[in-house]
Amino acid sequence: MTDKEESNHSSEVGAVRSLQETPTWALATVCFFFIAVSICLERLINLLSTRLKKNRKTSLLEAVEKLKSVLMVLGFMSLMLNVTEGEVSKICIPIKYANRMLPCRKTIKSHNDVSEDDDDDDGDNHDNSFFHQCSSKGKTSLISEEGLTQLSYFFFVLACMHILCNLAILLLGMAKMRKWNSWEKETQTVEYLAANDPNRFRITRDTTFARRHLSSWTETSFQLWIKCFFRQFYNSVAKVDYLTLRHGFIFAHVSSNNAFNFQNYIQRSLHEDFKTVVGISPLMWLTVVIFMLLDVSGWRVYFYMSFVPLIIVLVIGTKLEMIVAKMAVTIKENNSVIRGTPLVESNDTHFWFSNPRFLLSILHYTLFLNTFEMAFIVWITWQFGINSCYHDNQGIIITRLVLAVTVQFLSSYITLPLYAIVTQMGSSYKRAILEEQLANVLRHWQGMVRDKKKTIQTPDTDNNSNNNNGDIDSGESPVQTEVASEFRFSGRQSPILQEIQIQEKTER
């Protein structure tokens, strides 16, 4: 190899190549990989949606659709950053403004240092051209192409963290409710019915529910708040709480039917709440912009912000425990002697602003702040390393990470399940969930009717069928009787039941 060939060969080693200088096999391999991964992810999401639709998980299906919308917004932002990074880099601003409100002051370089770096690095000519365009005017670029690329990475990390945090919310919440299933099954046993005989008189203070929430050192409101604050960390929903709240809900909304599956209703209610917390509102995006604006060196905004989600989650958990405790106090004040199970009163006045959904809105905002906090920590560690100015104080970073994980666990495993059951003590209830259970009963009955009609082949059976139809005309159908006994909405007839009655008359 001649000296000239060696010189050309050495100049090609490590050189930055455009696509027209890239081997086609390399280009095709990279394209195939990203296309395959994208198609697999799209198929998995569609498969999940189909599965949820087949199992009639309406709330979770809507949550998946909302999550897809969030990912679409994040994808559009990343795409716009990549497409417009060249034009944005051409925007020049005075240097005096560029040196204000910096997140890391020690990384600022002088013009001479930058020029020397540019001379040593011939691979960044495209980015350097924008720098020289601005420097020739005595200005600097608003944000470099490298900065825009790093920002697009942040949106990618935020999307991944948003998915992981919401998945943790759903899985931990359902794990918390799994043990409630055994309590629900216990309500159908003879022992439970005997222990909660409606004809049995008991002193209110001697009931298990009252003994759990009432004591000598909870007579003042402050003492009760302190007790409820610590209670959320251990046994936040006791068995007696579940059974008492179940009895109050059934008495208020489902007549006196003890066969109602309250645990299944609460689980579907959690799915409804999950559908709410999975989204990202414009106010939340505005919060992201504000925190990026205030991320100035020495202000430690993110450190102080990391305590906000923890405080809010603890306050909401304490408030929910207080609602249950005040129900026990109300029962004691109204009745010294009760019959059967203590009856809690369903009323929106238990909640702030008489609005149970207000707590969920605050919790939704808090969960997003926590997700943003974890995404930011992962992003700065990935992009700038552990030796960057963001990690000057390792203790602060560790504290922020521990607080974020703690908030995620508390809100997912304790606060949201507690909210799902306590908010059923409001004046209203999620009628759509009850209607969905009712619809399942109707579908089961309709399937039985179709199977029975297929077996009718003789005139005798046809006559019997006509006689049965006559019975239906003169009264209620079997499904109407079953549904009416299963779901009696405090004397109000279900719209689905009314629709089925009209449909049956039309078919006949």
Swiss-Prot record:
It is a multi-pass membrane protein. Residues 453-492 are annotated as: Disordered. Signal peptide: none annotated. Its main location: membrane. GO terms for cellular component: membrane. It is found in: Membrane. The modification Phosphoserine is found at residue 494. Keywords: Calmodulin-binding, Membrane, Pathogenesis-related protein, Phosphoprotein, Plant defense, Transmembrane, Transmembrane helix. Residues 436-457 are annotated as: Calmodulin-binding. GO terms for biological process: defense response. It holds the Pfam family Mlo. It comes from the Eukaryota. The chain crosses the membrane at residues 22-42, 69-89, 154-174, 276-296, 305-325, 358-378, 402-422. The C-terminus contains a calmodulin-binding domain, which binds calmodulin in a calcium-dependent fashion. Belongs to the MLO family. May be involved in modulation of pathogen defense and leaf cell death. Activity seems to be regulated by Ca(2+)-dependent calmodulin binding and seems not to require heterotrimeric G proteins. This is MLO-like protein 3.
